[in-house]
Amino acid sequence: MCAAMTMNVAMVDLQHRLQLQREPLTDQQRQDIHTHPVEGYEKLQQLGVSQIDWLHAVRDHHETRTGRGYPRGGNDSSEQAELLRLADVYCAKVSRRAYRRAVPPNKAAGELFMDNVQQGGNPLAAVLIKEVGIYPPGSFVQLGSGEVA
């Protein structure tokens, strides 16, 4: 839980700016995004965090099983880091941006699952989707009877 709440600690200001930005990322913004996992790791250490699982999950939450992630490009991240990555991707999909609409939760879950299958399939994606649900609390759905619930 601590890792999930602090995984983007090094880019809080940038996230707020990007929320409103309509233009493509600048080179500096792209660099800041790619370095935020390590900077977050270092910032948490400076703040006194010593739990290695927490620190590694923050550092590795953009790594992928295919080795195409960042910042290290490794494929040996922990299950905790992988779960954070999946949750981060899901949250990004369902969040509105100035340049695009939010993806509906059921579609975001489907995309997350299919993307994960293409990367070799990790059971954690199914676990996350099962926990979050395809219609999270607060969602409106139309029942077979036509009633909206």
Go through each PLM region and give its residues.
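Histidine- and acidic-residue-rich, metal-dependent catalytic cores
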Residues: 1-149
